[in-house]
């Protein structure tokens, strides 16, 4: 079903790959993009389980918007191993205004399709999704 605000549908592969990340831990991260030709959100890239947060941030385009989910492993102050799934809305300052508006208007609908998101981040610059910020939001 298309999003009434932006007309963007969510591709079935997006939901399927997210379920694989969440339940099987098949991927470390997934990036998604809006395909304006088909008017839907589609999978852009899949990060392998051994990929790092640096691999993830390096995969984000410098001047194009993306949505992403990242399975973040961390150790609490009590020395417990935990994991949280982050939803990241990447809208760099250098991206086109139309693209920023399209991603902003489709975000909430897309996020609702991904059941199991625990933390949300919005970033317009790489510093806004640094490892320090991610760790602070996870704890």
From Swiss-Prot:
Signal sequence range: none
Protein name, per record: Actin-depolymerizing factor 6
Lineage: Eukaryota, Viridiplantae, Streptophyta, Embryophyta, Tracheophyta
SS bond list: none
InterPro entries, A to Z: ADF-H, ADF-H/Gelsolin-like_dom_sf, ADF/Cofilin
Keyword ATP-binding tagged: no
Family assignment from sequence similarity: Belongs to the actin-binding proteins ADF family.
Organism: Oryza sativa subsp. japonica
GO molecular function: actin filament binding
Lipid biosynthesis keyword on record: no
UniProt-listed GO biological process terms: actin filament depolymerization
Residue stretches making up the ADF-H domain: 5-139
Gene Ontology CC: one annotated term: actin cytoskeleton
Keywords assigned: Actin-binding
Role summary: Actin-depolymerizing protein. Severs actin filaments (F-actin) and binds to actin monomers.
Pfam family, one: Cofilin_ADF
Gene: ADF6
